[in-house]
């Protein structure tokens, strides 16, 4: 059936269109983000990046994985998907998030985190083995000692993760 998703190795078929994971240079990944990301520019720093291409070789999406932006999470065992950007290709987000999770665990990281806006449903994250961890308030990076122009959404974000996360102590 041409309209159903099928995984064959590292390839996905959807409606007759195949997407597959491929390596990509940092310059290519950052260029794609500059052209296609809805609300962010390129991240500062990265540990690795990967991409999905279609059967014609057209770049359809990229993921950038780096150290956690939140200092309290930067323990040497945690990674963050700091950017994920596609052109809307079916299942590209799931493939990119799944690859980020697998690579991180294979490299010895114990957990990963990423953040989405409330209007982004999270189906791709759930499909690729990530769990909803809760909400976190957005905030500005601008402080009196170092004023900055905020160019990203400052509202509530959904936190997603995989791996070993300590449970918060209950009040029971």
Region annotations inferred by a language model:
Residues 1-17:
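Short, Lys/Arg-enriched N-terminal segments with co-localized hydrophobic residues
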Residues 13-44:
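Short amphipathic alpha-helix that is part of the acyltransferase structural core
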Residues 18, 78, 157:
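A residue-level signal for beta-strand positions that form part of recognition/binding surfaces
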Residues 23, 47, 53-54, 62, ...:
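Acyl-donor binding region in acyl/amide transferases
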Residues 39-42, 131-135, 167:
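Short secondary-structure junctions
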Residues 158-172:
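Charged phosphate-binding loop/patch that engages nucleotide di/tri-phosphates or the phosphate backbone
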